[in-house]
Amino acid sequence: MSNENEKQQDVLTDELEYIEKSGGIKSDNIHCISIIGQIEGHYILPSEQKTTKYEHIVPLLFAIDRSDEIEGVLIILNTLGGDVESGLAIAELIASMKKPTVSLVLGGGHSIGVPLAVCAKKSFIVQSATMTIHPVRVSGTIIGTPQTYFYFEKMQNRIIKFVCDNSKISKEKLKALMLETDQIATDTGSVIDGNEAVELGLIDEIGGLDDALNELERMIKESKNHGDCHGDSCKI
């Protein structure tokens, strides 16, 4: 009897370690990934900050897309943003997955969290959530030359293109929101709530966990009928 208890305890410990490392948990045929805190990429963030680690999420997404057991992915976001390259890379991976994906923004989907919010085949946001849209930023010393600003513009255009390709917002409107000057003190950008995000076409629908799960189940059924859920086959 004690051996059985020890085995159960070992399984529970393994599951807890997996959740802690990957920010994800598998329930039946759906895998839930949480993207929280800051996106950690090329540099290690201070230990007191909550982070989503790029090196954990990338192999996890690969394993999910190759798994025969997992039929759909729910991405839950409450992120401040973080490393631009890593955040965009994660978003690109999710957008290219063949399996049904649904994102749900809770609390916030700020900065590079915006591409992560729209990368799923269907996106939801709760009414109380907010999203901060602003130009690309960099910490540390920069060289004050035209080439530096040209580099920033190229990086920003990559983000704008990805967001517009994976949502219904126009390029002109997104740029205008990024360059707004009367919403954030001593900075440029916009803060929008859940209703505004849907009205602008950035997010598909207002909804919570039940709405996101119901939509994901619908997409899973549809993908079984069509063979996969790549591209727009599962989108409404």
Segments (PLM) and residue ranges:
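N-terminal organellar transit peptides
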Residues: 1-104, 108-114, 119-134, 138-236
